[in-house]
């Protein structure tokens, strides 16, 4: 009977707009519609075509803000990269002097590190983190802090994780701490009316941008934590960072932080509230490369050249 048949589900409006802009023209599977009609159990459905899935992934990647140099980052780090897990041991009070005043601060101490296979961990992390994100309700976010010197490969590894998230259809955002703070911290005391209007427009945009980071982004990469201490108003900068990280932790959304700070530096530098959040929601790792990883990657630049034939 006709009552057993369900009409084909209409194509979403946002997809219709993309179809009209000829995003899928030339696809033989769907004829340029982006969707394929299928029949299952007597019902007609519209199933996204492979070309539409590819388009979706490309859009997620484009919006992610991942630098071009890392768009193909993958779990292919070689054995020159050591990857060590530091488990928190507990807190210890220490007497420090800040601006000439002696104060007690708690420092987070760690157990002896365990060396791990960095590529294997990356694959496991993606599987587990996405499984946590898909849980209802979300009760845990497994965030990472990747500490290491310049050129150790920590940003490459963070972006390899981000790319795998994207390949699985998850929203990702990459931010350099400098980029984030330079956009957020503006001079609000200008008397120039035009600048005031421009500033308000930017802040309205940033409020929406920040809300997206806090509420909708499945994975945030925050690169080069520690930059905020180079700002003239580092108290405001630190408050912005803390607010961003706290909101994501409260919503059980994972964040990967990279920093040049050593782990003991990190826990001594930041206030107790932030250190406590790190201990509760973040896994600590130290990345070491026997050579500068960026120099190793630059060897690829020589491919295709026959330098021997050019020698006089």
Residue ranges and their predicted role:
Residues 155-170:
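P-loop NTPase Walker A phosphate-binding motif
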Residues 170-171, 216-219, 251-257:
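Loop/turn-to-beta-strand initiation segments
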Residues 1-124, 293-312:
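A short, basic N-terminal segment
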């Amino acid at each position: 009977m006709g009552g057993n048949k369900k009409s084909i589900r209409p194509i979403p409006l946002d997809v219709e707009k993309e179809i009209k802009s000829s995003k899928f023209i030339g696809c033989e599977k769907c004829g340029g519609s982006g969707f394929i009609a299928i029949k299952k159990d007597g019902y007609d459905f519209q199933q996204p075509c492979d070309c539409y899935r590819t388009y979706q992934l490309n859009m997620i990647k484009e919006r992610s803000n991942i630098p071009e140099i890392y768009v193909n980052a993958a779990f292919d780090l070689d054995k020159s990269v050591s990857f060590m897990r530091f488990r928190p041991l507990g807190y210890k009070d220490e007497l420090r002097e800040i601006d000439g005043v002696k104060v007690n601060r708690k420092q987070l101490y760690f157990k002896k590190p365990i060396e791990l296979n960095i590529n294997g961990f990356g694959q496991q992390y993606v599987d587990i983190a996405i499984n946590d994100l898909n849980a209802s309700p979300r009760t845990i976010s497994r965030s990472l802090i990747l500490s290491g010197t310049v050129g150790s490969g920590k940003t490459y590894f963070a972006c390899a994780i981000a790319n795998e998230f994207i390949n699985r259809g998850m929203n990702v955002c990459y931010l350099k701490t400098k980029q984030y703070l330079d956009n957020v911290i503006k001079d609000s005391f200008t008397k120039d009316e035009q600048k005031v209007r421009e500033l308000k427009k930017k802040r309205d945009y940033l409020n929406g941008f920040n809300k997206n980071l806090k509420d909708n982004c499945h994975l945030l990469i925050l690169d080069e934590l520690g930059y905020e201490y180079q700002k003239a108003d580092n108290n405001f900068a630190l408050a912005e960072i803390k607010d961003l990280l706290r909101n994501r932790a409260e919503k059980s959304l994972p964040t990967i932080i990279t920093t040049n700070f050593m782990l003991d530096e990190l826990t001594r530098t930041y206030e107790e509230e932030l250190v406590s959040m790190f201990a509760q929601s973040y896994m600590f790792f130290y990345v070491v490369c026997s050579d500068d990883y960026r120099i190793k990657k630059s060897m690829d630049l020589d491919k295709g050249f026959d330098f021997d034939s050019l020698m006089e």
